[in-house]
């Protein structure tokens, strides 16, 4: 077990420096990043000269994305699979709590920091704002939910800063609580973290093959976050781990999930760090994880960010070139003033038509989200209705009091699956709608408009706060109670038959009356048992319906809020683009008018200035064309 505390950080840091070297992790090819930053700066300078503050803001945000990338990797899995130990061994630092109990109790975000640090992010207080409270590094080894620094407020997550070279290039690990323990959320709760993740590591030990919940989670996680791997842990404990890995690989192949499986041993990794043993480190197979993070995660995320930034630069240069080119054509041709009146009318008509065409995106977005909201809500209700019907059929086939734990587990798993499937489907439909809106701009001849990216936290949610299915009291009938029910039913039979038999001279209690009493008593007992079973089944069905209604109330609200947030994101994204396009067309017309009124003495200076700015924009575009085909270098994370 990796020790916790600041002293442990210092000791392990010295060991790491002796063994692996303090290799600095940087994004791949910093010189190429410098070229992109230089292109952004040149474009910003031209935008400022032309008083295009909107383009300056967009390019400034793009500059921040390219210079300070953060690649988020979610570590998820069932309870007791070795997730936290994997993270600690990967970083060579005690960044996450490890123990025999439920170690990770809240989400832990580990990112780079020159000095070890830790803080709690607390839930919103009475003023509606969250708070961050610094805590000693030693406290991450305790249950932070009860930390005195929280002041009784709910702890949303723990943010840990670790001086690990692996994190210096922008990697950030999100360690999630294990699933399956007392009070732990379903595996679908982790789905809410995946849309904001660049990769996912699904941790499963080699004691057994994938369980059904694990396979379901792997399939759904791959649909939301295609970049990921399965990490098979504890290979040092199970001699038959290779058979388990091969079986799990076959399961993934049948499920059509192209995720690699990396078998590792955190214990061997810890010993390798302690003993400065490179051969033991290779045997732990941790270099394979580092290679995966370097080649498949960090480099791909960097390429995706760069592609988006290059698109922003290209869009800005095109808009600036429209305005500058229009002005230059007028200034450079004095005879154009004679044709200015008719030409301006034509340009105005073209501008108005272009603006009207770009305005179609609002209709596409509005209609699309109305359909999406209705479809998602209908899909969720259909799934919940199916869960309810299946549960009622299961209840009708047994005694609920004897099988209530099994029924409750099946219902909760079915609800988690339904919520997760609906979540994934809504995410995919939202991405498709974003592409449809971008296509409406392309139909208007504006091919440089990029589709909005939905990968940030707008799709995130919290499925872990859903209440559990209520209990049902299982009280089997005692022998005495059964006798009372039978005697209550048999008494009438004994009296009735006894009185009839008294006509022929028999007593009240005779073989006929006793036999009739036994028959009627047995019938009364069976009828009471049947009524009791019907009553219990009715109560169980009502319990299930009430549970599903509660879940539907919470999840439907979360779904609507999530879709509204996506709609606002798309609306703001495309409204900003539409305003930029409209402004570019308007300023192009204004520049044409102003250029026609330029005095002869100022004409030459203005021509040179316009040619200089257009030349810079042309060089920027040439450099963009040269950068695009080479966006495939692999990031380097240093040695494992």
Swiss-Prot record:
> Membrane topology type, per the record?
Single-pass membrane protein
Q: Where does the record place it?
A: Cell membrane
An example of a Pfam family matching this protein is Dynamin_N
Q: Which sequence ranges form a coiled-coil region, renumbered to this chain?
A: 560-628
Instruction: Explain the consequences of disrupting this gene.
Output: Deletion results in increased susceptibility to isoniazid and accumulation of intracellular ethidium bromide.
Instruction: Establish whether keyword Transport is in the entry.
Output: no
Please state, per the UniProt record, what induces or represses the expression of this protein.
Specifically induced by a broad range of inhibitors of cell wall biosynthesis, including antibiotics that inhibit the synthesis of peptidoglycan (ampicillin), arabinogalactam (ethambutol), mycolic acids (isoniazid, ethionamide) and fatty acids (5-chloropyrazinamide). Down-regulated by the nucleoid-associated protein Lsr2.
Keywords, comma-separated and alphabetical:
Antibiotic resistance, Cell membrane, Coiled coil, Membrane, Transmembrane, Transmembrane helix
Chief subcellular site?
membrane
Query: Does the entry feature the keyword Coiled coil, yes or no?
Result: yes
Q: Which N-terminal stretch is annotated as signal sequence?
A: none
Give the residue spans that cross the bilayer. 497-519
Query: Which is one Gene Ontology cellular component term of this protein?
Result: plasma membrane
Give the GO biological process terms.
Answer: response to antibiotic
Q: List the disulfide bonds.
A: none
| A molecular-function term among this protein's GO annotations | efflux transmembrane transporter activity
Output this protein's name.
Isoniazid-induced protein IniA
């Amino acid at each position: 077990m990796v020790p916790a505390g600041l002293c442990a950080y210092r000791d392990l840091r010295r060991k790491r420096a002796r063994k692996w070297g303090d290799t600095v992790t940087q994004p791949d090819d910093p010189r190429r990043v410098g070229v992109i930053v230089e292109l952004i700066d040149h474009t910003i300078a031209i935008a400022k000269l032309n008083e295009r503050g909107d383009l300056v803001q967009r390019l400034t945000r793009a500059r921040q994305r390219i210079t300070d990338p953060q690649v988020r990797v979610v570590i998820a899995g069932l309870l007791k699979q070795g997730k936290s130990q994997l993270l600690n061994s990967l970083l060579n630092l005690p960044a996450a709590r490890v123990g025999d109990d439920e170690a990770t109790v809240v989400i832990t975000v580990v990112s780079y920091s020159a000095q070890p640090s830790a803080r709690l992010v607390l839930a919103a207080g009475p003023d509606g704002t969250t708070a961050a409270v610094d805590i000693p590094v030693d406290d991450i080894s305790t249950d932070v939910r009860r930390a005195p620094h929280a002041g009784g407020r709910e702890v949303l997550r723990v943010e840990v800063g670790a001086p690990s070279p692996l994190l210096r290039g922008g990697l950030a690990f999100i360690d999630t609580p294990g699933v399956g323990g007392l009070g732990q959320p379903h595996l679908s709760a982790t789905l809410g973290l995946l849309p904001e993740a660049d990769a996912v590591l699904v941790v499963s030990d080699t004691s057994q093959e994938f369980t059904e919940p694990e396979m379901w989670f792997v399939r759904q996680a791959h649909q939301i976050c295609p970049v990921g791997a399965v990490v098979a842990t504890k290979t040092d404990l199970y001699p038959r781990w290779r058979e388990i890995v091969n079986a799990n690989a076959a399961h993934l192949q049948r499920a059509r999930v192209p995720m690699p499986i990396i078998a590792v041993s955190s214990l061997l990794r810890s010993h390798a760090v302690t003993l400065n043993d490179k051969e033991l480190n290779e045997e732990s197979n941790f270099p394979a994880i580092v290679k995966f993070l370097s080649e498949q995660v960090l480099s791909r995320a960097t390429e995706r960010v760069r592609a988006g930034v290059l698109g922003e630069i290209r869009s800005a240069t095109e808009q600036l070139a429209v305005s500058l080119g229009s002005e230059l054509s007028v200034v450079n041709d004095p005879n154009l003033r004679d044709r200015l009146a008719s030409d301006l009318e034509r340009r105005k008509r073209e501008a108005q038509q272009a603006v009207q065409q770009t305005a179609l995106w609002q209709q596409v977005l509005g209609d699309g989200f109305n359909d999406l909201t209705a479809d998602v809500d209908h899909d969720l209700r259909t799934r919940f209705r199916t869960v309810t019907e299946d549960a009622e059929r299961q209840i009708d086939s047994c005694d609920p009091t004897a099988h209530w734990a099994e029924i409750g587990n099946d219902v909760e798993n079915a609800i988690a699956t339904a919520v997760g499937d609906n979540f994934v489907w809504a995410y995919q439909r939202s991405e498709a709608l974003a592409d449809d809106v971008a296509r409406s701009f392309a139909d208007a001849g504006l091919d440089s408009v990029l589709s909005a990216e939905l990968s940030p936290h707008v799709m995130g949610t919290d499925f872990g706060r859903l209440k559990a299915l209520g209990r049902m009291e299982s009280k089997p009938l005692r022998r005495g109670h059964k006798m009372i029910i039978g005697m209550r039913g048999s008494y009438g039979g004994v009296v009735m038959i006894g009185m009839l038999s008294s006509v022929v001279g028999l007593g009240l209690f005779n073989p006929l009356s006793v036999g009739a009493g036994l028959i009627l008593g047995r019938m009364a007992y069976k009828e009471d048992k049947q009524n009791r079973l019907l009553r219990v089944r009715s109560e169980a069905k009502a319990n299930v319906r009430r549970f599903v209604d509660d879940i539907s109330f919470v999840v439907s609200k979360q779904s609507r809020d999530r879709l509204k947030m996506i709609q606002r994101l798309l609306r703001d994204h495309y409204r900003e683009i539409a305003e930029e396009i409209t402004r570019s067309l308007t300023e192009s017309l204004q520049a044409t008018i102003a250029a026609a009124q330029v005095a002869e003495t100022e004409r030459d200076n203005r021509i040179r200035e316009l040619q200089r700015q257009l030349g810079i924009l042309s060089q920027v575009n040439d450099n963009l064309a040269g950068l695009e085909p080479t966006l495939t270098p692999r990031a380097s994370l240093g040695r494992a």
